[in-house]
Regions:
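Pyridoxal 5′-phosphate
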Residues: 1-140
Length: 140
């Protein structure tokens, strides 16, 4: 089989799988609980968070693990909009964005935000001039 939808999901890298196997087989404790197995899981998550942070020169407190892309899209878009709505309530997106992005923007519209949705050309590209023209003083 030839799989061509790697934007939706991707095969787990063998090195990642090797690191995850102990947690999938034996060390599957709830990292938010209080028992010993849970503590081991929490420690592993904290180590992973520190490794990711070091890789991208971030503070570990800035690293949030999600269950997938749609959850991450919602967290990023809605979280940023809600946290910064005192600075503005205008967002810019693109008509061919992932549905999770578009749905997050639609939800924010229902909550009083304004959303400008830009189209694309025949090659799927957004015109940078359209982006510049869409930016307003209240754009987040």
């Amino acid at each position: 089989m030839i799989y061509l939808d790697h934007s939706a999901t991707t095969k787990v890298d063998p090195e990642v799988l090797e690191q995850m196997l102990p947690f999938l087989r034996d060390q599957f404790g709830n990292p938010s609980s209080v028992y010993r197995l849970a503590g081991q899981s929490r420690a592993a998550i904290d180590r992973a968070r520190e490794q990711v942070a070091a890789l991208i020169n971030a503070d570990p407190r800035e690293i949030i693990f999600t269950g997938g892309g749609s959850e991450a899209d919602n967290l990023a878009i809605k979280g940023y909009a809600w946290a910064h709505q005192d600075k503005g309530k205008h967002l810019i997106t693109c008509a061919i964005e992932h549905h999770a992005v578009l749905h997050a923007c639609e939800r924010l519209q229902k909550m009083g935000f304004e959303v400008t949705t830009l189209g694309v050309d025949q090659h799927g590209m957004v015109d940078p001039q359209q982006v510049a023209e869409a930016i307003r003083d209240d754009t987040l």
